[in-house]
């Protein structure tokens, strides 16, 4: 919120947003519609809720990594492939990772990759 951003002297580029499953969906729907671009989006096992709506409302271009398990039965792996296609058509360069033999969860490797992605975009 605005109070915390002012208290900690944060600008949008100091912020990373992310989520798992529905949290990822909300992050994707809101993250690229922000007028003040956040640094990055880290998404696990989500999908774009409405590509048509989102394509008409693109405002910013944060760094994005999306990860998904190939055995996910809650949010099928096709969701990642559709998101990758959407972002490609809209001239985004995103990173993706598909985890083999992984259902609807965040594997340890996913946590590590998310952290590496964050460090890379903050030069840590």
Give residue spans per PLM region.
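Active-site signature of alpha/beta-hydrolase-fold catalytic machinery across serine-
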Residues: 29-33
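C-terminal catalytic histidine-bearing segment of alpha/beta-hydrolase fold enzymes
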Residues: 81-124
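Alpha/beta-hydrolase fold nucleophile elbow
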Residues: 9-19
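Short, small-residue-biased leader/transition segments that mark boundaries at the very start
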Residues: 2-3
């Amino acid at each position: 919120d605005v109070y915390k951003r002012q208290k900690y002297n944060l600008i949008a580029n100091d912020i990373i947003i992310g989520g798992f499953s529905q949290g990822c969906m909300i992050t994707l729907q809101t993250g690229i519609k922000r007028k003040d671009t956040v640094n990055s989006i880290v998404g696990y096992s989500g999908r774009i809720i409405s590509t048509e709506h989102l394509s008409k409302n693109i405002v910013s271009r944060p760094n994005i990594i999306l990860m998904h398990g190939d055995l996910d039965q809650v949010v099928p792996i096709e969701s990642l492939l559709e998101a990758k296609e959407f972002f490609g058509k809209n001239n985004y360069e995103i990173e993706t990772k598909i985890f083999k033999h992984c259902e609807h969860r965040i594997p340890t490797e996913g946590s590590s990759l998310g952290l590496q992605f964050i460090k890379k975009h903050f030069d840590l």
